[in-house]
């Protein structure tokens, strides 16, 4: 697969902003449907998204189900990288991670992107 067939989605939010979580899943699922590889790069509170069962705990009224989007994302091979520093600072070293999730830092992100990728990030703020 070519490097430009990879999409990185940055997310810093979890239950504090379910709409950002929803948007990240919508973008990721659409990328996978288009035949691209999708990776959620999770930092700050966003790492919670990669914990087992999280997707069932949040929703956005009148929007697609985050749990259903999560299931499709994982089924189609979507991946999650949880920032190791963020995992440590939140005391989540013993967390149970969802399928496709790994605690990986910047070097692994750079390896995934190789020379080029589409990068989609939620605004920080």
How does the language model describe each region?
Residues 8-22, 54:
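Short, glycine-rich nucleotide/cofactor-binding loops
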Residues 21-36, 40:
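Histidine-anchored nucleotide/phosphate-binding helix
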Residues 1-4:
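Basic/polar N-terminal segments that are highly enriched at the extreme N-terminus
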Residues 95-102:
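Short, electropositive alpha-helical surface patch
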Residues 90, 104-125:
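Short terminal interaction segments
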Residues 46-60:
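N-terminal beta-loop-helix "entrance" segment that forms/cooperates
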Residues 57-89:
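A glycine-rich helix N-cap at a beta->alpha junction
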Residues 38-43, 80-84:
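Short internal beta-strands
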């Amino acid at each position: 697969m070519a490097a430009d067939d990879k999409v990185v989605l940055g997310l810093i939010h979890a239950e504090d902003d379910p709409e950002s979580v929803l948007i990240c899943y919508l973008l990721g699922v659409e990328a996978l449907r288009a035949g691209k590889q999708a990776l959620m790069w999770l930092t700050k509170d966003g790492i919670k998204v990669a914990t087992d069962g999280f997707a069932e705990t949040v929703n956005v009224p009148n929007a697609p189900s985050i749990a259903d989007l999560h299931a499709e994302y994982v089924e189609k091979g979507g991946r999650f990288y949880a920032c190791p520093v963020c995992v440590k600072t939140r005391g989540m070293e013993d967390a149970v991670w969802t399928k496709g999730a790994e605690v990986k830092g910047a070097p692994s992100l750079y390896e995934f992107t190789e020379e080029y990728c589409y990068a989609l990030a939620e605004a920080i703020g």
